[in-house]
């Protein structure tokens, strides 16, 4: 059996390899810059030269809209001589490595088998580097390492690090801290003897109350943040704006109900990368192989007597459905109060990526272990082939 150090090191190696591919694109041209960064980060060049973009309405707006934690980090980097655009191209490497480390650790909390941790990080890196989120260096790029850190420390019952990661999450990407808060609440309940029961652990209850109070106070700063750019667009206004129509720039209100609720940008419940366009320009739901593996995990656990690794699954597994329930709940709430809680898809697309990467890694490792039981060590080649294919 290969050591935990080997699989952890291999996870780091793959994260670095993905980073190298990203760097080739990021530094491929003198004027190369990620699309979201072009809007949300360029204004931070003012930290290096305060005379830039004088009276520029859009730059002023993005400066106002950027979370203070992100702006402070970029400002700190500019103070040590790293301008915003250069730092924007470098920070995704660190974000990817931290996400990989915490994903590996979370996976091992659920199934203490190093192979499961490696496969989970491999799936996660595929998801992250094929999207623009991590590479953008914008607030949602910081979501992944911070949310995974929160989950890891929550599973470890490490109170201070967990609370710290929750606070950072609130300052960097507010929508995700609502999902995290929902997870905290759900963990206070358990299903026992066909009844829903509240935990009697006073430590958990106190931690949940304190965490929710801290999050509430931080979110209040966003609620009462003064604005020179008018109020948030209302649902009635959005329905009459062509930009929000199916063919508009935002395309929120899709005419097909199924597409609107599943794969449509901003309104659909699934990540955009799980969907493809058909020849008639209607979006359909597409399941990548690792997503199918994640969906197969409950089936594998139902037949747990046939899988020897199932005995090593810990109670930490419940964190995955808790994340899903919290994400879906806030997705529906966001739809109910459209645009007051930002965009509905923000509450599910990132958490689904994380949950299915971990679930898929655990499921595949259990299947590979079963193959080894059937065919001996020679079938490990088949398992490796499956991983590469996926």
Where are these regions (language model features)?
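Active-site lumenal/periplasmic loops and adjacent helix-entry segments of GT-C-fold
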Residues: 7-145, 174
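Membrane-interface transmembrane helices that cradle and orient dolichyl/undecaprenyl
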Residues: 142, 147-161
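N-terminal membrane topogenic signal
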Residues: 1-13, 202-203
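Signature aromatic-anchored transmembrane alpha helix within multi-pass, membrane-resident enzymes
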Residues: 367-390
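Transmembrane alpha-helix segments characteristic
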Residues: 308-337, 359, 382-389
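Hydrophobic core segments of transmembrane alpha-helices in multi-pass, intramembrane catalytic enzymes
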Residues: 139-148, 179, 183, 349-357
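Transmembrane catalytic cores of multi-pass membrane glycosyltransferases
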Residues: 22-37, 48-55, 61-62, 174-181, ...
């Amino acid at each position: 059996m290969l050591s935990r150090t080997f699989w952890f090191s291999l996870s780091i190696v793959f994260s670095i390899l993905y980073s190298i591919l990203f760097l080739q694109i990021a530094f491929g041209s003198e004027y190369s810059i990620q699309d979201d960064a072009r809007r949300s980060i360029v204004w931070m060049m003012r930290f290096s030269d305060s005379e830039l973009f004088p009276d520029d309405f859009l730059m002023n707006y993005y400066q106002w809209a950027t979370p203070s934690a992100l702006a402070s980090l970029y400002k700190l980097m500019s103070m040590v001589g790293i301008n915003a655009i250069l730092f924007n191209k470098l920070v995704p490497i660190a974000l990817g490595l931290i996400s990989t480390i915490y994903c590996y650790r979370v996976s091992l909390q659920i199934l203490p088998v190093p192979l499961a941790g490696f496969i989970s990080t491999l799936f996660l890196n595929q998801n992250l580097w094929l999207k623009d989120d991590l590479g953008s260096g914008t607030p949602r790029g910081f979501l992944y390492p911070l949310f995974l850190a929160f989950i890891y420390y929550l599973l470890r019952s490490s109170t201070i690090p967990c609370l710290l990661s929750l606070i950072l999450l609130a300052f960097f990407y507010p929508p995700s801290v609502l999902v995290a808060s929902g997870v905290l609440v759900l963990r206070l309940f358990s299903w026992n003897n066909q009844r829903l029961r509240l935990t009697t652990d006073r430590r958990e209850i106190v931690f949940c109350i304190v965490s929710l109070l801290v999050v509430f106070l931080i979110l209040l700063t966003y609620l009462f943040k003064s604005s020179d750019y008018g109020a948030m667009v209302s649902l009635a206004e959005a329905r009459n704006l062509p930009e929000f129509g199916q063919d508009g720039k935002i395309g929120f209100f899709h005419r097909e109900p199924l597409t609107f609720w599943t794969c449509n940008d901003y309104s659909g419940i699934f990540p955009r990368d799980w969907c493809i366009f058909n020849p008639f320009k209607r979006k359909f739901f597409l399941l990548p192989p690792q997503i199918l593996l994640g969906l197969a995990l409950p089936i594998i656990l139902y037949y747990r007597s046939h899988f020897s690794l199932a005995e090593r699954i810990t109670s930490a597994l419940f964190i995955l459905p808790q994340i899903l329930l919290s994400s879906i709940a806030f997705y529906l709430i966001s739809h109910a109060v459209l645009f007051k809680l930002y965009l509905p898809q923000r509450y599910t697309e990132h958490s689904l990526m994380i949950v299915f990467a971990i679930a898929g890694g655990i499921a595949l490792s259990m299947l590979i272990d079963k193959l080894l039981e059937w065919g001996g060590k020679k079938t490990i080649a088949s398992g490796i082939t499956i991983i590469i294919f996926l």
